[in-house]
Amino acid sequence: MGQFNFNMKYACLLMMSALFNAPAISFADEFFNPALLEVREGEGAPTTDLSVFEVVNGQPAGNYRVDIYVNNEMVTADARDVMFSKNQDGKLEPCVTLAELSQWGVDTASFPELAVSDSECANLAGIPDAFADFQFNRQKLNLSIPHAAMNTRSLDEVPIERWDEGIPALLLNYNMNSYQSRYKGAETYESTYLNLRPGLNIGPWRLRNYTTFEHSNQSGSKWDNVYSYLQRNIVSLRSQLTLGDSSAPADVFDSVPFRGFQMASDDDMLPSSVRNYAPVIRGVARSNALVTIRQNGYVVYETKVAPGAFEISDLASTGGAGDLDVTIKEADGSEQHLRIPYASLPVLQREGKFRYSVTGGQFRAYDSHTEKNLFVQGTGIYGLPWGFTLYGGVQNAGNKYQSYALGVGKNIGSWGAFSADAIHSRSMSTDTGRQQGQSLRVRYSKNFLQTGTNFTIAGYRYSTSGFRSLEETLGTYRSDNNIPSYITDRRRNRAELSLNQDLGDNFGALNASLISEDYWQNERNSLSANLGYYKNFNAIGISLNYSWNRNTGLYGHAEQDNVVSFEINVPLDKFLNRTYASYGTTHASGNGTSHNLRLNGSAFDDASLDWGVNATLAGRSEQQVVGGNVSWKASHGTLNGSYSRSRDSQQLGYGIAGRVVIHENGITLSQSLGETIGLVKAPGAEGIGVNNYAGISTDSRGYAVVPYLTPYRRNDISLNSKTLRDDTDITYMTNKVVPTRGAIVRAEYKTAIGHRVLMTLTRPGGKPVPFGAMASLLKSEENASIVGDGGEVLLSGLPQKGTLQVKWGNGQGQETTCRADYIAHKSAGASGLWNATSVCQ
């Protein structure tokens, strides 16, 4: 029964707090007589000043930490302290400066009445119909400003003043994968792949490096420095300045790798409503397979996949361009090869929008034998009226190469959109001497809303055999005279077609693609076609794919490959939460038919553990393969492992990935990170989860790294209140940050570490401390609360024993102060509350 009485008291305190803080709607001012709540000891005895509560939402004047909104749109990255004072009506009025109003989009220049000569606080009454609404219970300050008094800007534009360059820090991103394969009667194959991405942030500057290491027992060890660069944003130009290794944009010319400098537009700095690209790799594995992605001979990505369809959507930008070569190494040692086009195309620009790039430096080839010739390049794309876009550029490498490009794009309304451009080149290469030629390119895109059809056609035609790109020309200047065939062959025609057809909710969707290429110097050509169908039946998904590839070699010999695959996925949530079963079959010419059965799922509340088991009957070999895989996303990194076994072979894979962030407050370990990240600072709050990020939680000091943020956009970093410990309170669980590209932004949270204590305070005569008195931890006004009826007060963040300071009175010479020493004791039950009784004297 005692426990019941205790809970009722606690509930009454909460109800009392809610009554004081609840919003009220009325046609007349509400009033209550504070005398009804006063407890007098006799004539002349001091009483608690409750006059501030006589009006609706009444609160004492002073500093309040609030979220600030303008016209119900949040304009501050996080809560901030604002001084409130009483106006003539007895209501609280905020002190905001002219600079702050201007920062938040108010047209202060048109309203000189805002300025007050003897105060830094702006006079909101200087704008007709403007007013401030302080919602105490939500700690929200909303400034209602007429639209005519606001500066014009896009609805989704984030003011530059809110962009956060982040904190100084050292970074190290690492990813290591090891793979072992044992074949009956053959030597065991072992390989290890490691990539390291160290970095340094100081103010707006970002220093980055990408280094890889490969080792196998067959080919030895090899280190490669893929790139190093120094970068910063130039806000006034909405651009990025890059010094070091990178690649020129591919919107007008083919992308060219360089070591030097580049100034280029960064469209991410623009609002979404007025403004980029890395391909998604898709394929089908017949067994537990190792997927390796190479670009220009470098390994840029490696991972292990389970049998069936896979998708790689986290391929990092390598700072280079060129088609991606994808190798799928199956458990039986066989390999599949895919080629994924990797190039971006010019896009139509809004009227008046200009995008540019200026690049200069050494041609950065992907092997040590190519000479480092100097070149410069400039491109520009400008949006003209009536839906036209004009674009062009120049390239110059002295007497070795010059080219000029000019193109136009047009939005042709219901007919779609097209672009056409031409490049004229003059080249001096070591294999063919001086030549000149032209390249023409036409593209067309159209959405048929009535039929749900979207298709894009892109065609390249090298109209003369004398045309060469900058990379093809400078690539012939080599110390070994061994010019690669991809430079000497010179593509003549390349055509691409992609089509997506929505068949409606009841019938699924179709997609198709076609790529054709041929060359001037030999009979080599290729033709690839793909057709896919997808459909969901009440959460059961099916897919059917057909691909056809024909490659003709240097002397006309053709190889052809046909692959047909079918897959069905069935959720098993009724039996096992977050689990699904899959069956897939693949028929490939030359490899027969394989069948695969999989069971996959995730575990824990935040789905931080992914697991899978599978069984495969592989192709013509009729090898039976069984295996499994597991991946665990922890706060300090990610671990993964896989194992498969057949009659003649075994495969074992394992890996670890993560990042180390060294900052002014210490060292924080995390999962692998993206380009732009956040650092949670919640001092002393250990084990607090971060919403929407599996496995991320604060360390023993209260720090955690949020691995992915969007630059130049509002990002909410929200802590999971369900993971709060009984001895931890956090005032605000969500912070809003606006990072610049590559920044590490800090999201600070106000924490109170200690016990929640329900305390009964009495005076030496045994009477309770008066209702409405303010109680706080001695020498700390952070832990403060209002005393309720019977001298009871609920405080959080208290040590087990300490001293409270209690004040009451009307502030007119009748204020009473006393101190109360206490020792708290844990309550029975699972409420997490502690109790204490103390005499205030």
What are these regions (language model features)?
Residues 2-5, 11-16, 26-277, 588-661:
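Post-signal-peptide, soluble extracytosolic/periplasmic N-terminal scaffold domains
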Residues 60-82, 684-693, 765-779:
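Short, ordered, surface-exposed loop/turn motifs in non-cytosolic proteins
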Residues 68, 281-283, 678-682, 755-764:
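A short, amphipathic beta-strand motif
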Residues 87-96, 315-321, 703-725, 729, ...:
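Short Pro-Gly-centered beta-turn/loop motif in secreted/extracellular proteins
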Residues 140-144, 346-349, 733-754, 821-841:
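Extracellular beta-sheet/turn segments enriched in Thr/Pro/Gly and aliphatic residues
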Residues 149, 178-182, 204, 213-217, ...:
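Transmembrane beta-strands of outer-membrane beta-barrel pores
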Residues 163, 190-203, 224-237, 372-386, ...:
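Feature captures outer-membrane beta-barrel proteins of Gram-negative bacteria and organelles
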Residues 695-703, 780-792:
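Short, acidic Ser/Thr/Gly-rich low-complexity loop/linker segments typical of extracellular
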